C-alpha cells in the first residue's frame, strides 16, 4: 500500500458547485438566490435575533434584578458529616474540613448547618452556624466558636 493509493471514503466528498456560470449549468443567472430581496444581495444575511423591524423582544421586556456584590457565599457542612469524619473531642476548623475532603474550597467562609444527628462532643470553629446546628453541637457537650 502506498500513500498514492489512499482514497477518501465513498460519499464523504462532495463536488463543489460552481454558481453563476451560465443558464445551462442549472445555477446560472441568480445562482440559486431567487429574485431580488435582502437575501439575494451580497451581504443579505439577517442576524438570528432580527424580528423584521419590529421592536425586538429584548427591548420590549423590562430590566430587573441585580447581583449583590457584597453577598457572602458560605461553603456549607452539615453536622452529620462532622459525625462521620471526626472523632470525639476533636477540634474542627475550616482547614481540617479541607484536609478530610468535606469541602473543596472555603469561599467567604464555612457555615455549619443542622441536618442530621451528632453524638460526639466536638469543638467546631467556623464562620457561621445555623441555630439548629449550634443547639445540636452544644447539646452533646461540644463547643461552637465563631471565627
Swiss-Prot record:
Alphabetically list the UniProt keywords.
Answer: Ribonucleoprotein, Ribosomal protein, RNA-binding, rRNA-binding
Which region is the signal sequence? Answer: none
* PROSITE patterns attached to this UniProt entry: RIBOSOMAL_L15
Q: Which GO terms describe its molecular function?
A: rRNA binding; structural constituent of ribosome
Task: Extract the ranges annotated as region (Disordered).
Answer: 20-54
Superkingdom classification of source: Bacteria
Disulfide-bonded cysteines = none
Pfam families linked: Ribosomal_L27A
Q: Which Gene Ontology terms describe the biological processes this protein takes part in?
A: translation
Q: Name one GO cellular component term.
A: cytosolic large ribosomal subunit
Q: Where is the composition biased (Basic residues)?
A: 30-44
Q: How does it assemble?
A: Part of the 50S ribosomal subunit.
**Which NCBIfam families does the record match to this protein?**
rplO_bact
Function of the molecule? Binds to the 23S rRNA.
Q: Which family does it belong to?
A: Belongs to the universal ribosomal protein uL15 family.
State the protein's name: Large ribosomal subunit protein uL15
The gene name on file is rplO
